[in-house]
């Protein structure tokens, strides 16, 4: 039995429920995911984010967008394990939670296409320079070292 709509809306991380939800979502179904562990995703506890979401967050003015992009990547990795593609339709952060709605398509080729958009976000605290990179390091043209976030979803939100 597959479902057209599954909503994961619990307290803290959605991780314990992602595998089951992705396995049971129908082709073309909508998967809604809420994360209330914003302290991890927004960079207050970066080691917790690394353990839960396999990515490093940023703690600056971009923290909510970076957190959403990390959450999207985590869902896409779980979906790819099931040969499904989780395409973000709508995402937002409000107060103490982040929420993303996905359209789920079947097919390993579609999943592989999404996985190519998992990269690193590099941020320079010196000049506020930003760039997306497949590599997780390097220095900014102003001479400062980049602060690294990710890997994360770099596609459209």
Where are these regions (language model features)?
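SAM-dependent transferase fold signal centered on methyltransferase-like domains
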Residues: 1-157
